[in-house]
Amino acid sequence: NHIVVMKGSDSAAMESLIRDADVVLLSMAGGLGIKDGKPYMDPVAYRDSYVGTAEGLIGALPAAPKLRQIIFCSSMNAYGAANGVNPVSENTPANAASPAAQVFIEAEQKLSAIETNSLKVCNFRTGTIYGPGREHRNELKHIAGKQIPFDGQSDAMLVHRDDVVRAIDFAIDHRLSGLYNLFNDIPENKADFFARVAAREGLEPVIWLGVFKGPRGVSNAKLKLAGFTFSDPSGEKEGANLLG
């Protein structure tokens, strides 16, 4: 194991990195910069983190003859409001509500287009990830009592960090391909779920403005039908290490 500092869009560096790989996992976060002494999201860098990395990997594929699977951790944000469709499944057309969310769709499409019988591509649309160090109360305290632009009436769509790891292992073991929603079974919407957490922790409730609409009635049935089971289906083990 070793660390390589590089841009994902650098195909030459990517060639060296994946030359002997049989599986590649793409799990990116990026685009955060500093402007006038304050953090801000750079849309160009953000797109390069996702779409650029997908393109860099695609350009490097001739150097990786052993590669048999690509797994990409995308985001539920790709659905946007899903054009008002309810329920929402993997067959529901994506409808990103912002340019930032559009990058997930573009990266998914670029990767899916290169799938062959010998090279499988699995795209996971993950929910909001929680777990040790990212407990619900820790995430909530940053927005408690504040107005935020997101849709409180959209599904909670949360997933434990370790269930993400387990799903990736499951995808490798079963050589999954295609698109899968990856979030647990919490039935509440965002407003109700985080109101319950706020009451428990003595925090002010969030004020959801609903500027960016989210999906409702989203299903995780496809992944469960494939045989995957969640270690934390109800979101109650937020501080637990579920892999130990």
Roles of regions detected by a PLM:
Residues 20-71:
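NAD(P)-cofactor binding segment of oxidoreductase domains
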Residues 109-132:
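Conserved beta-loop-beta element that borders a ligand/cofactor-binding pocket
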Residues 96-101, 127-128, 132, 150-161:
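Glycine-rich "substrate-gating" loop/helix at the edge of Rossmann-like oxidoreductase active sites
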Residues 1-22:
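Conserved Rossmann-fold cofactor-binding substructure of NAD(P)-dependent oxidoreductases
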Residues 138-147, 153-180:
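Alpha-helical substrate-binding/gating segment
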Residues 204-244:
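C-terminal amphipathic/interface module of NAD(P)-dependent oxidoreductases
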Residues 165-219:
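Mid/C-terminal beta-alpha module of Rossmann-like enzyme folds, strongest
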Residues 55-99:
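Conserved Rossmann-fold NAD(P)-dependent oxidoreductase catalytic core, especially the SDR/UDP-sugar
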